[in-house]
Curated annotation (Swiss-Prot):
Inhibited by potassium cyanide, menadione, benzamidine, raloxifene and norharmane. GO terms for biological process: xenobiotic metabolic process. This is Aldehyde oxidase 3. Homodimer.
Length: 1335
């Protein structure tokens, strides 16, 4: 054989164009290369860890053996460019654009209202596009699997799924209630349209068809390259790492002998994360992706041999094919593997992660290794000394030195045997989320019986997620051999395993009791599964099994969500050109879908631009003894290090410093920043800054700590009505308790982003920032630099999600960057990594609510005394406003005649918490709903009856003495009861629960009264600038910021109506403090209200100027009138202004008319829980919302759905975990789980109530951006109802309050049974726990 040649030339294609790189840097990933090198910015950075899908691209390769081209999606943030030799990459720009033509996927996701902020949209588009390249008519299951690796924080997924579903060969709909016609295609005649309810948000028939022949062809040059000899070693040398990709097995083995410590990389899904988050680098990395022997598939009578290089998707496809061809008794192991592969990671990760990498990494949460370990699988390994076989058993998985690969050995393939007739294998896993989440605990279990008996001859049980490695219950298994498979064996096995499978207190990951309970619960499920199969083989030989028990073996199905959205159609007499009230597509929808929408970090890098990385505190409360940045300053590419000493003006606001100076008050506080010529260099240098601390006591982390040390921010707030103490004495019953609500991360898809560009004279600066409040950012930067605000111009084109998290924080971060820009005299780009964003910026306030309720036996509440404590973190931020709002809105929909509410903000050593969608209402009203449920349980009454009994019924006054009319509240409630068929379904739930022991359903209906607005009058003002050009085109600028909530779309609609011109004439450029100064924050659901009035005012001014010209020439065109106005020297630009509602609260008197109006609503949700694992399935949700006269029903319904799913996450999924020292563990989607596409309700119906006038807002509309968040608690209380049903059946006492979020752990441990009782309770006093609740 001729010696292998060496080449340093990397060749691949991007969107049909050839890319050639010599000595490519192995540490450069595809995402960076696309965005910063070849300037394709449609692919977005969302997390950097492959978990969010924002950077999804399609990769295509040609296989010279099969002569086939494969297409697969991948997350570009984890793909090293060196791995792309011979590949074709397709990005969102490559499939369509507004400059050429848009692709059907792009069109449908945009016109189907599947975009809001648009940051996740390119990734969604590319996931769907790749699926269609492989399956032009996909199944619904394929769509759900495909989208499982993509996250969206705005839409609630329903419109995205619906857009994708339009490509299925047949889509389900209501069929006109059985008439056999599609509701989306039904046209109504004019008389029927008058005052009718519409259910069509877009015209499906307008979609262009999918034509697979029009896609990009695979480059012929790459086909020729693949056909050529593999006798080439590719070598790419970077700054710190050399990448070597051999072409033959001999070359690979020689390299591994020469570099035994060099890691092997194919998918980079493990090593990439390890290198990124630990800053570990390897001198040599070897890529065996071109070694044909690693991709072998051999199927014999003995079993399957699977190449170690096969991706998990390829393994899944192979196993599916084999299982379809063999009898079930031979495929037990294969079926178990398939079950795990369906939910292991997201589709993009499964497409690139290799089987061998999954095995060799030996991660404790590996889903496949426990099955392979009990399946007598064999590892075929090779070295220069020859081939060797290593058993893949518990010793290998535990890392026993004699049982694992030697450094010079390479895993070639894995042999997975077929199962025998009397062999039974099962797999189990429970994760925080159904898809794309590491398992909390998983297991592989196998039993072999003596032929035709139930006598155990072999037993194997392996658990993942219990210890530092996959662990075996080997001792228990050996003791059970020879026993019969019966209940006595099960009881003994549970006790043995509970004793053997130990989990120390404070074990990493926490949840010690829950994890041990899962281990035993899985054993019981295995027992039932095997018993069921034995019974199937011989119905007479084995005892009957109650159907009430067998239901636990049914996994929650992966079903596609569907629903109906209904709203009031516009009057049939309304001109077609008038867009108000119509479901108009998001103004930037197409640009979102094509990747052409420009976000802050998409802007081109200027010559000399520097990148900023911050150094944050590692201590919660400490004195800074010394700071040594000398090593960082000497690092490659570093220009400067910026500290508090460099701040020329104010170093922050109130108690919040830009740069910590003498003391740090939380983990994550910015101490200094490194400016370098690349982000990588800045990051690497930042890690070299040495800071010496001295701890300061006390360290306050939790609300309880704050209460102990009386550590508060601001005064106690209090509201009271009636005579509370007297009413308590008259009550039949009194109930006291407390409830805890965890915090929530904003998780906007675009992390905090800012660019600061010094203009070179008069200290002027342009600031491009992702902010809800450009004027506040301008003010903070000006104060920091000690210059007037007129030298600072803030630009906000669009924001990739905000939810309150980009109101005050961007001002702080922009100021940090501005100091660096002024010091260096160069442009600064400061984009937070997801981990840093979550660490630094805070989120929703965790809450402790204490309540005392006095009520009558019929459920009527006479008195309530409620005390709220929120964890504000280390600085005030907006915390005082949040507690005020929580108190003002706490009563929700209920008239409690004697009510006292008090609230305090606790000052702790956590990062400062801040504004979040709902602003205190989701926390405060949750406490009230907990009280309602507790009263219902105590009185043994239906919860809905207690809620109805206590609701406002007539015009009345709130606890802060503001009058309101509850008519629409009651209508929403009644409509929700009717739309959801509540009482019929409640009966069905009861019947379901009677038939099942281990699965229970619950249903709950929750009303809502949401007060819209800010607490001060000055917030209700806005300005706009409308300019008409001589060609008739119109440019609109206003003070609101496009966050994804559709404000720009609505402003164009307003201008279109007022100017009586088509929307196509109107353009919005950006929000800028030059065009519209002194703006207020875009938030509190008022953005469209106030800015719409300002745009309306400006347009009316212009129309009044044009009025004489129009009267003189009534038959003229818009263009003619505009030109004539110019000829007559009439100004064609106008500033509109709106001064709105008077809103002031007198806390001394406890009263104030502070809210312009109320939004009413109701939601009914049904869930199903698995009592053995704690998993739950959201079956159906019906929402009715009072939106008055919606300006844009598509936008408003999208806001309701997105807010609801965000609330669903708050109350059931999203859990921030802190160490006792105040360190946030959950710093990315890897650990922190927001709702994914499989978490939303199977049926998801949203109805806008029949409109009624609302004179306080433009066109009688209402702001609906926040209200739906709280309605997510309907899922929580449905879960609570299901748990209550389980506890009642077990003879347990009711639980008055379940803490939020109702995670799988909370659900499982509340459903107490014989298995939870086996697990000894941990004593938190004996040692420090791994994590603690902070409220």
């Amino acid at each position: 054989m001729s010696p292998s040649k060496e080449s340093d030339e990397l060749i691949f294609f991007v969107n049909g164009k050839k890319v050639t790189e010599r000595n490519a840097d192995p540490e450069v990933n595809l995402l960076f290369y696309l965005r910063k090198v070849i300037r394709l910015t449609g692919t977005k950075y969302g997390c950097g860890g492959g978990d969010c899908g924002a950077c999804t691209v399609m990769i295509s390769r040609y296989d010279p053996i099969s002569k086939r081209i494969s297409h697969f999606s991948a997350t570009a943030c984890l793909v090293p460019i060196c791995s792309l030799h011979g590949a074709a990459v397709t990005t969102v720009e490559g499939i369509g654009s507004t400059k050429t033509r848009i692709h059907p996927v792009q069109e449908r996701i945009a016109k189907g209202h599947g975009t809001q902020c648009g940051f996740c949209t390119p990734g969604m588009v590319m996931s769907i596009y790749t699926l269609l390249r492989n399956h032009p008519e996909p199944s619904t299951e394929q769509i759900m699997e495909t989208l499982g690796g993509n996250l969206c924080r705005c839409t609630g997924y329903r419109p995205i799924v619906e857009s994708a579903k339009s490509f299925c060969p047949s889509s389900t709909c209501c069929q006109m209630n059985g008439e056999g016609k599609c509701c989306l295609d039904e046209e109504k005649n004019e008389p029927e349209r008058k005052n009718s309810v519409c259910t069509k948000l877009y015209e499906k028939k307008e979609f262009q068809p999918l034509d697979p022949t029009q896609e990009l062809i695979f480059p012929p040059e790459l086909m020729r390259m693949a056909e050529e000899s593999q006798n080439t070693v590719l070598t790419f040398r970077g700054e710190r790492t050399t990448w070597i990709a051999p072409g033959t097995l001999n070359d690979l083995l020689e390299l591994k002998m020469k570099h035994p410590s060099a890691p092997l990389v194919i998918g980079n899904t493990y090593l990439g994360l390890h290198m990124k988050f630990t800053d570990v680098s390897y001198p040599i990395i070897i890529s065996p992706a071109r070694i044909l022997e690693l991709f072998v598939v051999t199927n014999t009578k003995q079993g399957l041999t699977l190449g170690a290089g096969l991706s998990l998707t390829q393994v899944k496809n192979v196993l599916s094919d084999v299982v379809s061809r063999l009898p079930k008794e031979k495929t037990q192991i294969y079926c178990a593997l398939l079950k795990q592969l369906k939910t292991l990671a997201g589709q993009q990760i499964r497409n690139v992660a290799s089987l061998g990498g999954h095995i060799i990494s030996r991660l404790p949460t590996s889903d496949l290794n426990p099955i392979l370990g009990i399946g007598n699988c064999i590892l075929n390994v090779a070295s220069t000394e020859g081939i060797q076989q290593i058993p893949l058993n518990d010793h290998f998985l535990a890392g026993v030195p004699d049982a694992i690969l030697k450094p010079e050995q390479v895993l070639i393939s894995v042999f997975v045997p077929r199962s025998s007739k009397w062999e039974f294998v099962s797999a189990f896993r429970q994760a925080p989320r159904q898809q794309n989440a590491f398992a909390t605990v998983n297991a592989g279990m196998k039993v072999v019986f003596k032929e035709d008996t139930n006598t155990i001859t072999d037993l194997g049980i392996l658990y993942g997620g219990i210890g530092a490695t996959v662990i075996s219950a080997d001792k228990s298994c050996r003791q059970l051999i020879g026993r019969c498979w019966d209940e006595e064996m099960l009881d003994d096995a549970g006790k043995m395993i509970c004793e053997e499978v130990s989990l120390l207190m404070a074990a990493p990951g926490g949840m010690e009791e829950y994890r041990k309970t899962l281990a035993i619960s899985f054993l019981f499920m295995f027992y039932l599964d095997v018993l069921k199969q034995l019974k199937t083989r011989d119905p007479h030989k084995y005892p009957d099994i109650s159907q009430k028990l067998l239901h636990i073996l049914e996994d929650f199905p992966l079903t596609m969500p569907y629903g109906m959205q209904s709203f009031q159609d516009v009057d049939f007499q309304q001109p077609l050109q008038d867009p108000i009230g119509r479901p108009i597509m998001h103004q930037s929808g197409i640009k979102h879908a094509t990747g052409e929408a420009v976000f802050c970090d998409d802007m081109s890098v200027l010559p000399g631009e520097l990148f900023l990385a911050v150094v944050t505190s590692s201590k919660s409360h400490a004195k800074i003894i010394s700071l040594d940045a000398s090593e960082a300053l000497a690092s490659l590419g570093v220009v400067d290090v910026v500290t508090a000493r460099d701040v020329p003006g104010d170093n922050g606001r109130e108690e919040e410093s830009l740069y910590a100076q003498d003391e740090v008050i939380c983990v994550g506080q910015i101490v200094c920043a490194v400016a370098a010529d690349s982000y990588a260099h800045a990051q690497q240098a930042a890690k070299k800054v040495k800071i010496v601390y001295q701890d300061i006591e006390p360290m306050i982390v939790t609300v309880q700590d704050a209460l102990q040390y009386e550590s508060f921010i601001g005064p106690e707030r209090k509201l009271e009505q009636g005579n509370v103490e007297e009413a308590f004495q008259c009550a039949d019953q009194i109930l006291e308790g407390e409830v805890h609500l965890g915090g929530q991360e904003h998780f906007y898809m675009e992390t905090q982003s800012v660019r600061v560009v010094p203009k070179g004279e008069d200290k002027e600066m342009d600031i491009y920032v992702s902010s809800q409040d450009a004027a506040f950012t301008q003010e903070m930067v000006a104060r920091t630099l000690g210059i007037p605000k007129n030298r600072i111009n803030c630009h906000v084109k669009r924001v990739g999600g905000a939810f309150g998290g980009k109101a005050s924080k961007p001002g702080l971060l922009a100021s940090v960057a501005a100091v660096a820009a002024q010091k260096t005299g160069r442009p600064i780009r400061f984009i937070l990594e997801r981990r840093d964003d979550m660490l630094i910026t805070g989120g929703r306030h965790p809450l402790l609510g204490k309540y005392k309720i006095g009520f009558m036996n019929n459920g009527k509440i006479k008195a309530a005394d409620i005390q709220l404590y929120i964890n504000g973190g280390c600085t005030p931020d907006d915390s005082e406003l949040v507690i005020e709002y929580a108190l003002l809105k706490l009563e929700n929909a209920y008239k409690i005649p004697n009510l006292r509410v008090r609230g305090r903000v606790c000052k702790t050593n956590l990062p400062s918490n801040t504004a979040f969608r709902g602003f205190g209402f989701p926390q405060g009203a949750f406490v009230t709903e907990t009280c309602m449920s507790a009263v219902a349980a105590k009185c043994r009454l239906p919860p809905e009856k207690v809620r109805e009994l206590n609701m406002y019924r007539t015009i009345d006054r709130t606890i802060h003495n503001q009058e309101f009319d509850p008519t629409n509240l009651l209508q929403c409630w009644e409509a929700c009861v009717e739309n959801s068929s509540y009482y019929n379904r409640k009966k069905a739930v009861d019947e379901f629960n009677q038939q099942r022991f281990w699965k229970k359903r619950g249903i709950a209906i929750i009303p809502m009264k949401f007060s819209v607005g800010f607490p001060k009058t000055f917030y209700y003002q806005a300005a706009a600038l409308v300019q008409i050009y001589t060609d008739g085109s119109v440019l609109v600028a206003h003070g609101g910021v496009e966050l994804g909530q559709g404000i720009n779309t609505k402003m164009i609609q307003v201008a279109s109506r007022e100017l009586k011109i088509p929307m196509s004439y109107i353009h919005l450029d950006e929000m800028s403090t030059v065009t519209v100064p002194n703006t207020v924050t875009t938030g509190a659901s008022t953005g469209a209200d106030v800015n719409g009035r300002a745009v309306q005012n400006a347009c009316q001014i212009l129309m009044k100027r044009l009025e004489p010209i129009i009267k003189q020439n009534p038959s003229g065109t818009w263009e003619e009138w505009v030109k004539e106005a110019f000829v007559q020297s009439i100004s064609l630009s106008a500033t509109g202004y709106f001064r709105g509602y008077q809103a002031d609260m007198d806390w001394e008197k406890g009263e104030g008319d502070i809210f312009p109006y109320f939004v009413f609503g109701a939601a009914c949700s049904e869930v199903e829980i698995d009592c053995l694992t704690g998993a739950h399935k959201n079956i159906r949700t019906d929402i009715v919302m009072d939106g008055s006269f919606s300006i844009n029903p598509a936008v408003d319904i999208g806001q309701i759905e997105g807010a609801f799913v965000q609330g669903l996450g708050l109350y059931t999924l999203e859990e921030l975990k802190y160490s006792p020292e105040g360190v946030l563990y959950t710093r990315g989607p890897h650990q922190y789980k927001i709702a994914s596409v499989t978490d939303i309700p199977e049926e998801f119906h949203v109805s806008l109530l029949t409109p009624t006038p609302n004179p306080k807002a433009i066109y009688s509309s209402k702001g609906l951006g926040e209200a739906g968040t709280f309605l997510g608690c309907s899922v929580f209380f449905a879960i609570a109802a299901a748990v209550a049903a389980a506890r009642e059946e077990r003879g347990l006492s009711p639980i008055w309050a379940i803490n939020s979020p109702a995670t799988a752990e909370v659900i499982r441990m509340a459903c107490e049974d014989q298995f939870t009782n086996l697990v000894p309770q941990t004593d938190s006093k004996c040692c420090k726990p791994w994590s603690i609740p902070v409220a």
